[in-house]
């Protein structure tokens, strides 16, 4: 659908509809495709879901409605140009791969599911889990309220140079640092007892995984690291 310039629907269609040339589900709850030429767009009230790849053009501003609940994977991943995206209080579901790499994310304070830290980290509302991160930062500092770095939390954070993991963290999920290709070194605190499969897969420059505590205390090494066990330094 990325190369479409116009969409025409049968006048009898009961599944889809066009509003100002843009494609929606017939009930208006799913935003399917932005076909406009303007770089500034407001998704209308009533929309509850942004469908995968609904906007694949360069934009300047995008305003999301107060009715929005779900931002599907890849929805805005190809939408470059928006420096800061405000996530409404109504949103309950979104993914790290929903957004373009250069877009900062800011969650409305009234959101009951998520909260943002410095427009970079997205945590659960309680602040105990890192859910995802904006991918345009070079330095990431995880607050000491966090106990878990979730699966794919730092997916494709290719600009990451350094990350600070506090002693409060006990779990690092599968693929947590997938394709953090600029990261050269990471220190795992003694509090961490579990690292998921492929946590460091495709981290091509990661040559030092420094783990505090006794050797081999965390199973599954080297967790997809390109340099294998040579990259792991126990008991640092």
Per-region residue spans from a language model:
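Structural signature of tandem-repeat unit edges
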Residues: 2-22, 29, 33-49, 57-70, ...
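Short secondary-structure boundary/capping segments
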Residues: 22-23, 224
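N-terminal module detector in large eukaryotic regulators
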Residues: 99, 222-225
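N-terminal regions of proteins, emphasizing targeting and processing segments when present
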Residues: 173-176, 196-199, 222
């Amino acid at each position: 659908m990325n190369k479409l310039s116009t969409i025409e629907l049968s006048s009898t269609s009961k599944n889809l509809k066009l509003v100002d040339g843009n494609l929606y589900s017939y009930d208006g709850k799913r935003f399917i495709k932005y076909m406009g030429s303007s770089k500034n767009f407001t998704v209308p009230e009533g929309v509850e879901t942004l469908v995968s790849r609904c906007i694949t053009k360069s934009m300047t501003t995008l305003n999301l409605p107060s009715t929005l609940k779900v931002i599907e994977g890849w929805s805005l991943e190809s939408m470059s140009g928006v420096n800061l995206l405000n996530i409404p209080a109504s949103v309950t579901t979104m993914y790290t791969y929903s957004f373009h790499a250069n877009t900062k994310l800011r969650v409305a304070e009234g959101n009951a599911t998520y909260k943002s830290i410095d427009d970079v980290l997205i945590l659960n509302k309680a602040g105990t889990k890192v859910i995802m991160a904006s991918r345009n930062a070079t330095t990431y500092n995880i607050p000491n309220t966090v106990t878990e770095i979730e699966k794919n939390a730092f997916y494709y954070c290719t600009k990451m140079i350094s990350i600070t993991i506090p002693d409060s963290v006990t779990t690092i999920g599968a693929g947590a640092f997938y394709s953090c290709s600029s990261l050269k070194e990471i220190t795992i605190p003694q509090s961490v007892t579990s690292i998921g499969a492929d946590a460091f897969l495709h981290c091509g420059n990661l040559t030092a995984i420094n783990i505090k505590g006794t050797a081999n205390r965390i199973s599954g090494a080297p967790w997809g690291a390109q340099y294998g066990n040579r990259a792991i330094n126990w008991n640092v």
